[in-house]
């Protein structure tokens, strides 16, 4: 009968609507869960970026510290005849890796507000100046002056290392590279 067909059709439609509603709820829940998982992945990715950035900046600082040890060592090796540096061939404080970072690179752009960054310039310049003075004194065979310059170079180098170490643990150092 027509009424039976209508009732059957209505019942079928009701079940289809209920099924569609349930599927919509499931899709909504699935969408919420997916969004939560994506947020968790984004957060984890951000943490990984920060960790990698911190490791890179720490590595950069360690390389810079090592550069200064090598710089000093090269000056000393010249004194004992294992190296042939001259005062004229010694790099300036703006030419070395740290100098480029400080004056031209990301250090200038991202770390100039850090107190240790501001304190770094003078001792870094002194390391290079005293190294040059020591080599000039060696060339002139003025060993007393050379010794004084070497002592001052070491003092300045210690200050540089101290300031780099201070920046290593700061927010600024996460951006170094």
Task: Label every model-predicted segment.
Residues 8, 12-177:
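N-terminal membrane-sensor/transducer module of prokaryotic signaling receptors
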